[in-house]
Amino acid sequence: MWRDSLCTAAGYALGRRDAAALSSLLSEAAAMMEV
């Protein structure tokens, strides 16, 4: 999925700690869009 690759790319760019926060933010946004 494009979200997974985006999180991975962001993780490499920002570092693991920021990536975890970004990943959770993207999951929430994705959940809202799917509803």
From Swiss-Prot:
Its main location: mitochondrion. Detected in brain, kidney and liver (at protein level). Pfam families: MP31 (PF22001). It is found in: Mitochondrion. One of its GO terms (molecular function) is L-lactate dehydrogenase inhibitor activity. Keywords: Mitochondrion. One of its GO terms (cellular component) is mitochondrion. The keyword Mitochondrion applies. Disruption phenotype: Enhanced global lactate metabolism with elevated glucose consumption, increased ATP production and decreased perigonadal fat pad weight and fat/body weight ratio. Elevated serum and secreted lactate levels. Conditional knockout in astrocytes results in initiation of gliomagenesis and development of neurological symptoms that include seizure, ataxia and/or paralysis at 55-65 weeks of age. Interacts with lactate dehydrogenases LDHA and LDHB; interaction with mitochondrial LDH leads to inhibition of lactate dehydrogenase activity, preventing conversion of lactate to pyruvate. Inhibits lactate dehydrogenase (LDH)-mediated conversion of lactate to pyruvate in mitochondria by competing with mitochondrial LDH for binding to NAD(+). Also inhibits cellular lactate utilization. This is PTEN upstream open reading frame MP31. It comes from Mus musculus.
